[in-house]
Amino acid sequence: MDRLIHTPEGVRDVYNQECTKKLYLENQIEQVFHAFGYQDIETPTFEFFDVFGREVGTTPSRELYKFFDRDGNTLVLRPDFTPSIARAASMYFMEETMPIRLCYRGSSFVNSSSYQGRLKESTQMGVELLNDDSAMADAEIIAMTVKVMLDAGLTDFQISIGHVGFFQALAEEAALSEEVLNELKELISIKNHFGAEELLAKQNLRSDLFEALRDVPQLFGNAEILEKAKGLTRNPAAREALDRLATIYEIVKDYGYEKYVFFDLGLLSKFHYYTGIIFQAYTYGTGEPIVKGGRYDALLQHFGKKAPAIGFCTVMESLMNALERQKISLPIANTKTMLLYPDFLQPLAVKLANEHRSKGMDVALVCFARDKVLADYEEYGRKNQFGGIVYIQKSDSVLAINLSTGEVQPVEL
């Protein structure tokens, strides 16, 4: 019986007020996407395994939901939208060289370990900007991230921005083995400065290179940190990455959003497809980033189209948690009306409901049961987000009940 009424571990039902809030937020975010000129795209919930395979550098195989079709092909529930969008763009926009702006919403599925306490199905909304490798494109994506956070109702948040090219250039110069490199990435990701220093001390590096790599976990702060980082290395590729971040910051200032920007040169990702800037949006009330994104100029080539790209995704569950814990209310009005009627006035009730629906009102017809009283319907209405009740007592006697104030007024038909 438990399996009939309960959901599996890692997934949950969303209903009533929570569902209303979630849909409101999704519509707010979608308006931001459209305001910046992005067009909607839908991709399948499942794809061939190769779309998310190791070569793409997305979710580890053990965390994928895999199954077989009747022809024996291995299929995967999408864990990440970006490879799906890259595949679709490579198919439908192969010859397009002008910028392509796409936006999406839907569920993603990651079979994470139970002890991590994460949902295995989450709702993601995001954008992808293809065929544009400019700093302006990077800044546009950052500005959209800020706008999404603001329009969701958040005011106290920050966008942490890094550049994978900075660390990558230093690591390549140091010629670190893959094992050491992976361990160093892990230490930097958790800001373990001392662990990174101990590991690097065993690598027989030049003093300046040792110091630069050692300090990566501590290179976070405002725009001044970029100049500090530049003073640590003469590596051309590393300095180019820093210059790119500085240029992006100047454009973000044109948007008026610089106060939300924070630089973190130790920001790394488990997704290997990132090639340029990488960023995450944080606020109070959730341990996970609400928004994650970055530049992935080589990913589309895996699907046959050589094109630069940048994008981000918003994790709706993290956003909802943050709003709830910060006690931020959303301006959602209870606009539904309950049209309550006795059974002998059903034709009149249907006629009135249709008239009001044609005017754009949300009207639910409810027949007054003989074993109920008016107070039962008032309680039912409040629980189910009705704004008011129109109660047809007789063909010439109608009451309007405001469920927020309790005010009752007679009205004429």
Regions found by a protein language model. Name each.
Residues 1-83, 139, 160:
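TRNA-binding/sensing appendages of the translation machinery
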Residues 21-32, 47-48, 82-93, 102-154, ...:
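Positively charged, Gly/Ser-enriched RNA/tRNA-binding surfaces
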Residues 52-53, 168, 190, 319, ...:
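Short Asp/Glu-rich motifs
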Residues 63-69, 176-197, 205, 257:
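Acidic, His- and aromatic-enriched active-site or binding-groove loops in soluble protein domains
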Residues 97-98:
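Phosphate/dinucleotide-binding and metal-coordinating scaffold of catalytic cores
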Residues 120-125, 161-169:
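Short, conserved phosphate-binding/catalytic loop or strand-edge motifs used
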Residues 144-151, 165-175:
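Hydrophobic mid-domain F-helix/FG-region of cytochrome P450s
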Residues 156-165, 184, 262-266:
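Short, surface-exposed recognition loops or helix-turn segments adjacent to catalytic cores
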